[in-house]
Amino acid sequence: MKGILKMKKYLYTLLSLLFVATISSCEKGDLLNIITQDIDLNENSKEYQQYLKERIESYLKTYRFEEAKKLVPKLTEEETQKRFWVLYNKYHQEALTQGCGYILASGDTLFLKVMNIDEIAPSQLKALTSFYDYVELKGTNQETTLWGLGNYPALETLSFPSCFVSKVKDLDKLKQLRVFSLTADKEKYEWWFTSKAFKPIDMAGYDLSKNDKLDSLLFDGVDISNLKVTSNTMRLLSLKHGIYTNASLNNIHARHIDIENSDAADDELIINNKAIQRLSIETNADNNKPFKLINVANSSLHKLYVVETSMEQRTLKKVILNENIDTLTIGGYISRGDVPQQSVELVGLSRLNRLKRLSYNPDFSPIATKDLPKNIEGLYIGGSGNVPYNDGDSFDYSHLSKLKIYSNGKFISANMKLSTAIDSIYLFPSQVFGDLKALDFSGLKFTKADIYIGSLTRNDVELPMLKRFVFPATLKQLKLSNAQSEVVDLSRCTHLKSLYVDDSRTGERAIKKLILPKNLKKSDFKRQHKSEFENDYAFKLSDINNETVIENLPSWVENDGNGTYSVPND
């Protein structure tokens, strides 16, 4: 009976070993630790000796020489020991030319085997993304240097998905390197280095100055303040949860730079990097150190995206623009709406004659319509927070002769004058300025509209329903939800191809009259692609009140008796 129990324990351990041998992810450290524990067997038994042989061979194949070295002396047969020492030397020599390793502060090397399932020759391998993990590094709490990348001179992609190495050797030998990705995750760091607080990895130990073919740098959890890179222009620098400086943004010649939730080491960012075409910086001021000023006047960038969010206090004070900008997003919000905030000053906006697309949050920067450059083609107003405009403010967009898309998710005004150039309009307002009684778009020429009115307030008081909502003759596509209007007039819209009207409001807030165009043709609403419509036709009236009068309702429209009007499939 005792022998049977021993055999079961041996088989269980052997199965565990065979399973773990297939595990390649560094996240399996705890599983690997299971098989490093001693088992309750007689070391001189045939079963245990067989187990040792398999265990040693597994260690050697994954270049864990220090573990194999501990076990070889436990082999009872001298010839077997000699055979494994020969095998040890074979794999050790292989590791020198086909592996990598951690160089510890003591000078010792812990070898790492590169994950290479297709067994491509090291000199030809183009992508290195993972290793067979050395789990005992978890308990060392040591800073290390990574060695061995020179064995892979053809690498085009180098990715460290969970890396806390402070220095990497032989990067200069990767002449074909195009993409370098490194992630240092805080939670994983604290799991590995149990006695140290996490801080972004200092990239001073990474020298990329000789990698002239670099195309993309993708970093998460690192400090790029001291990073050395090639002087050649690359495509992308992406940094998340890290640290950057004004100098690093100027010294790294990337056409696109994306910074997200990272600390700005400098209060002022003065960008003169001529390589940058697009700069995006998104900051959560509650978790990251924000900057107070950004000046791109002397740069050549065309696209600028600046967003700062926080709970109570805005840090950014001023944005100085350059005349080459064609796409601008300025936004962010303060969660505490009751805390007065200073608006962000935009310098040079009215001079941006090349600006095609502008997206802004009025709570961040309440731009006056008179300051909008005349060549804008897309205007997007939205975001959380207050709308610091007044009833007397002008919202005259008529001078924007090239405006094609107008999107406003914040407000509408009795003083609003839209450009006749608009082709598509998107309205999702919650606030009203001025004495708004009706919305009459009959003088405009847009072909597409997506509008949700909901509950409108003026000075925190809900407004009564609009008297009339009138749409232009040019309209082809309409999605209208909760119109908050007594009359919805579509009588001019004889070119309609897609119509969706939803009115979930009831009682006095429901639409009183819906006027459709006369002589609508069923064939005009035949849809070709999937959409919100459930059948073959792009025509649907939903949640329509039983008291609502529908004028000119076509005979080919079917009413289900519950407020839905649609077209049956052919």
Per-range role (PLM):
Residues 160, 238, 380, 479-480, ...:
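Short beta-strand elements of solenoid repeat domains
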Residues 20-23:
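Bacterial Sec-type N-terminal signal peptides, specifically the leucine/valine-rich hydrophobic h-region
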Residues 436, 443, 452, 462-463, ...:
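Eukaryotic tandem repeat interaction scaffolds
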Residues 238, 356-361:
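Predominantly recognizes leucine-rich repeat
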Residues 2-3, 14, 26-196, 202-212, ...:
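N-terminal capping/linker segments that flank leucine-rich repeat
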Residues 443, 456, 474-477, 491-492, ...:
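Extracellular beta-rich repeat passengers
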Residues 486-487, 505-512, 517:
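Acidic, glycine-rich calcium-binding repeat modules characteristic of RTX/beta-roll
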Residues 8-16:
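Sec-dependent signal peptide recognition
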